[in-house]
Amino acid sequence: CIRDRVISNAHNNSTYTSPVINFNELIELKNDIVAISGGKDSHLFESLKRNNISDASRIIDSFTKYFKDDFVLEVQRTNRPDEVEYFKNILPLAVEKGIPIVATNDVLFANQDDYEVHETKVCINTSKTLNDPNREKIFSEQQYFKSSEQMENLFKDCISLIENTNEISKKCNVSFDTKEYFLPEYPVPKAVSYTHLTLPTNKA
């Protein structure tokens, strides 16, 4: 399917630490996908953060040129820096260019109480500890999979953004299993229990 192909290409062809798909590849899919401007890690967010309106306008125009009505702007409320200011700056551009804004959540974990587990993984990746006073905290406990009701309550002052999001959902067909775990398999010698895997850690 298109989703699997995009994800595979993003992982296999990226020269960055995170999966990336280039703009030309996106253009090839213009008739099959809805393009959303992106959140805090997007070029648009960075341009408006620097108050570079002309660059932000150029980015928007480059997407609408190819995706037409299937390009929308995106705002989030995850209690992270600069989100409020970004919302204020993106509104005039949306009105000027006649582009809908959708409300999304930058989801990184399933439940709100998974936040500490996520932060632990981040610390492992960055060689930091949870109680390190100098550790940069770039994620929020609000980045969990919220229900429709929670999102509606979060954006109750601008419910049209939720309505725009619902319109996109009508164009998409997505399903995933939340009950099954997909974890790597580690070989264990015969006649040895899985506690064998903890031995190297205990020795260290």
Language-model-detected regions and their locations in the chain:
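A short, hydrophobic C-terminal helix/tail in secreted or cell-surface proteins
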Residues: 198-204
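Phosphodiester-processing cores and adjacent nucleic acid-binding clamps
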Residues: 3-197
